[in-house]
């Protein structure tokens, strides 16, 4: 801080990404946003009323429990919860489920429909509990651009008409 003559602080990488998005990117000027990274794990940053959410720990949204897809018999890889979002939808979870790295499965629609089911379920939980103006998705798994329309459709399906807002059109 002394060397740079600017305020300095430490936080998680995903909170840094979220701050970048609300300062300069996809959520510029928003007061309530969530950034989720899905890659080797699942991390999340939450901005609520213009402040990063901190409590006893940083938000562990990657460890929210998931209801398994009716056609998915995979038990999950999380050593603590097995079927949490990270255990079901992270890159290592996909590799354990299919025996191949996620980026080699791009042409198999069922893989991405299942992935969208879990991510969509998590987003519904986040929408209903935190009410963000925007949710930003990042991380290696999200490089599969076919996921975005599948996730959007899954969120609408799982919300089942409960919420109707313009923000849901721009998840």
Regions found by a protein language model. Name each.
Residues 1-79:
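Phosphate-binding/catalytic loop of phosphoryl-transfer enzymes
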Residues 2-6, 20-30, 68-171:
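ATP-binding/phosphotransfer module of carbohydrate and carboxylate kinases, centering on a glycine-rich
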